[in-house]
Structure formats: C-alpha cells, structure tokens
Amino acid sequence: MSHTIRDKQKLKARTSKIQGQVIALKKMLDEPHECAAVLQQIAAIRGAVNGLMREVIKGHLTEHIVHQGDEARREEDLDVILKVLDSYIK
C-alpha cells in the first residue's frame, strides 16, 4: 500500500488547512489589511505547504528507499525524490 494512501486522512487534513489559509488570504486581499498581516498569512501558507511536503517526503524515503530491498529500484526511487527536491527548492 502506498504511503500516501495509508496516510490519506492526515495528508487531506493538511491540504484542507492550506486551502483554508489560501481562502483567508484571498479575503484579506479583497479588504484593506496591513501589509504585515498579508505577509504573515503568506508565511503561514508557506509553512503549511512545507509541512505537507516534509510528511510526503518522509513517507517516500521510508517506503521507497529505506525499506526497498531491490538496489536498482532504490536508486531509481532516490533519483525521483532528488529531482522533486531540486524542483521544489528552486
């Protein structure tokens, strides 16, 4: 079973939190708000997205790297995660 399926409820809860934060940001932009409050909301969204990414990466590393018995498959999975990290960190 894929770790994203096994952890589906936890991951969906995180995405719901992110969705709520984005909706709140959109409302803030429709009304007059201090720039600091808008920046704080953006930082909160970024933190929530980073937390989601961290959880999925941890699951991937555990499931597909640490517990992968096939060395060739482990190298393929590692290459995938490194490419994802490169694109995420850009």
Swiss-Prot record:
Family annotation (Gene3D superfamilies): Metal-sensitive repressor, helix protomer
One Gene Ontology term, aspect cellular component: cytoplasm
Main location as per UniProt: cytoplasm
Gene: rcnR
Keyword Phosphoprotein applies: no
Keyword field contains Glycosyltransferase: no
InterPro entries: Metal_Tscrpt_repr, Metal_Tscrpt_repr_sf
Transmembrane segments: none
Organism expressing this protein natively: Salmonella arizonae (strain ATCC BAA-731 / CDC346-86 / RSK2980)
Keywords, in A-Z order: Cytoplasm, DNA-binding, Repressor, Transcription, Transcription regulation
Pfam families reported in the protein's UniProt record: Trns_repr_metal
Family from the record: Belongs to the FrmR/RcnR family.
Function: Repressor of rcnA expression. Acts by binding specifically to the rcnA promoter in the absence of nickel and cobalt. In the presence of one of these metals, it has a weaker affinity for rcnA promoter.
Protein's recorded name: Transcriptional repressor RcnR
GO biological process: negative regulation of DNA-templated transcription
GO molecular function term, any single one: metal ion binding
Subcellular location(s) of the protein: Cytoplasm
